[in-house]
Amino acid sequence: MKQELAKSYQPKDFEDRIYKMWNDSGSFTPHVDSKKQPYTIVIPPPNITGQLHMGHALDETLQDILIRWKRMSGYSTLWLPGTDHASIATEAKIVEAMRKEGIKKEDIGREAFLERAWAWKKQYGGRIVEQLKKLGSSCDWTRERFTMDEGCSKAVKEVFIKYYEEGLIYRGKRIINWCPKCLTSISDAEVEYEVQAGHFWHLRYPLKDGSGYLELATTRPETLLGDTAVAVNPNDERYKDLVGKTLILPLVHREIPIVADDYVEMDFGTGVVKITPAHDPNDFEVGLRHNLEVINVMTDDAKIVDAYPKYAGMDRYEARKAIVEDLKAEGALVEIEDYSHNVGTCYRCGTTVEPRVSKQWFVKMKPLAQPAIDAVKNGKTKFVPERFNKIYFHWLENIKDWCISRQLWWGHQIPAFYCDDCGEMVVTKENSAVCPKCGKPMRQDPDTLDTWFSSALWPFSTLGWPDNTEELKYFYPTNTLVTGYDIIFFWVVRMMFSGLKNMGEVPFDTVLIHGLVRDEQGRKMSKSLGNGIDPLKVIDEFGADALRFMLATGNAPGNDMRYSDDKVKAARNFANKLWNASRFIMMNLPEDFQYHGLPEDLELEDRWIVSKFNAVAKEVGENLDKFEIGVASAKIYDFIWDVYCDWYIELTKPRIQAGGAAMEKAQAVLVWVMRGMLKLLHPFMPYITEEIWQVLTDGESMIIVESYPVYDAKYDFADAVQFEKVIDAIRAIRNRRTEMQVPPSKKARVCIETTEPELYRSTAVFFKKLASASAVEVGEKFDMPDAATAVTDSVRIFIPMDELIDKDKELARLKKEQEKVQKDLDFLSKKLSNQGFLAKAPEKLVEAEKAKLAKAQEKMERLKKLMND
């Protein structure tokens, strides 16, 4: 070999160099190849405002593992990257930056604002892309896309116009979710609900005829200003005679009717509900049924409108306090009751959402939802784990029309134009329009589309649609979507119906759902808790491979996982073990070593390691097929650390020391298995495996494009199981010596009672090397009553005690140890029988004490056994 592996594992020394080598070689860029099967993943496009966080790191690691595995398995693999324009988040960042300059966006106008936005995107938008590269993401960067690039914009207009012409998109005045901070409408999926402590204000609304009043309760007394009716259930005998009568609205003194509607629950509260069509979605529907007036009482930033001078300009919560005081003064307030209820908040800023009636653009969802439901029911797309089917179905079966217009400037401007002269409206792909009726210039709708409208088209718009490109025909439908369970509603559902509607096929075969990365205590990472972990800092300290391997081994589809530095350190230690083992092997190869594959006439221990590798290759392939990435990585870890490093390398040392043909055969097998396990590990830890591969092979190829190991029946050696018996026997001797606290340096005879004497005579050298045996005797029967014994499924082993320990001294030591353990047992038993301790101590402390007791009991049993032996 021309090169030598560095003395210590220092990932900073080679990770950037390796990544550049891959990228420059074109390894990430697939081609349309009819001889190869395509495998496609589209990246969930991170926001241009974003910085890499642990959720991204998990998401990208899982995708990269699948892509690298499929690439090595002979597929034409496309991992298509890109970023999302993120309307609300990006606009908020730019508005905040302008605020610091003392400028409002309205001061400079739309065009100047958009110039700033594009400049901001150019400056910061690529930041997260560079961070993804640090992780080792093998995306095809030549195909990188942006949700507002020319191609995506073309697709957005095409879909909008198609839906509009088919009656699937309409403009109407409906109740929507309004964020008073972001100053835009948001969709139902963008509203997050949280339980908040609030109140029920019990109020009296007097009848106009003076015959009495109706009592009702509300959690939002400030909306009373917009009440246009009070409703009761038509079957409620208490109020049947009052339906149709008129009430006087407190404070406002407006006349409002009593209406009968099935929406009202008779057994909830008094069975009377105030109806505010402009500020409650259910009230809006009641208002439509009864032709009620819709009165908006709030401005865009949730302040009371000028129509109510006493409260005009007050924030909604400030107005609430004033209105409650005035209701009290008027005698309309009966009581205030504590009440906790679900409150909708904006998923972007956390502000309480204000339901309000507004003229917006909507997508009719029912016709689009059913095909998306059928596709999963028919197995065209499957969720992993399957339990997420239920969430997907529930959302689609209860879906409402999707509000797609946003009162923002950054985003895809709605391609609708209005004529202010004659009132005509047209929807067109053109950037400017002339009125077809009167010939006057038309004004484009100022609103932009919901960010998720363009993201919904991502699997096909990025491949050239609406043009029928070769890439689209070859790489669509995509194969696997990897995403968190938190965006099933936002993104997965919308891609499903968009793909089916516009392409006639599902956008992906499988949706692999992962959970959140939580902190060590199981808490969600957040700015407010200050418990977020920066993946780039982890990479800087431990290397990208350590972070990737920790995320892979901790992953089970659909489940949350916990991050800890200790887990990353363990992964780093594993990388270090691999590095040192590889260095040892290469240092023991001659300079002119030539690799010629696996030699013939293998020794038993060689056939054992080859069979073990063949078995693990088969299992890992099966695990990856089932998306059991965590299980697969654990099996590779066990093979490399326990089987190859701790056993096989040690088994070959006598042959390497002996030299000659025996040494050459051992070297050849060591390298054959090493090459295979580097390939097996590569998708999980790409950098270290490539660096070792480059040194091992003198750069003859790159491991990234090598073939992934698969099961081969010719490497299933029937007698490999025989050597497993030898391993079990050595392990049993080691365990027995450890129990007796005998150091490895102290050697003793080993007598093996077996019906297979030749197996153990031929492997005696391994007992001497690995079990501290001074000599190995093999026979069918031994009579050694004073010897220590160890038993496996195949043999009984005797170790003469007099060669290991002074029996009297050892008994005295064990007795002293037993007395100490008995004291611990007495103390812990007394503590855990104390009812006061059990009642007052934290649950974690009680559990910890119980664990100590169990450990002490186990130790006592072990000591008794040793003394009896």
Task: Describe the residue ranges of each PLM region.
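Non-catalytic terminal extensions that flank enzyme cores
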Residues: 1-54, 77, 334, 347, ...
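Residue patterns forming the tRNA-binding/recognition surfaces of aminoacyl-tRNA synthetases
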Residues: 3, 8, 17, 21-25, ...
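N-terminal catalytic cores of NTP/NDP-binding nucleotidyl/phosphoryl-transfer enzymes
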Residues: 33-94, 147, 156, 216-219, ...
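Short, solvent-exposed turn/loop segments enriched in Gly/Ser/Thr/Pro and often Arg
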Residues: 34-36, 44-45, 78-91, 144-152, ...
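Secondary-structure transition/capping motifs at alpha-helix termini
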Residues: 68-76, 97-110, 130, 134-139, ...
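Feature 926 captures the class I aminoacyl-tRNA synthetase adenylation module centered on the KMSKS loop
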Residues: 202, 394-453, 457, 501-544, ...
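Conserved phosphate/anionic-ligand binding catalytic regions in large, soluble enzymes, centered on
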Residues: 216-232, 348, 354, 414, ...
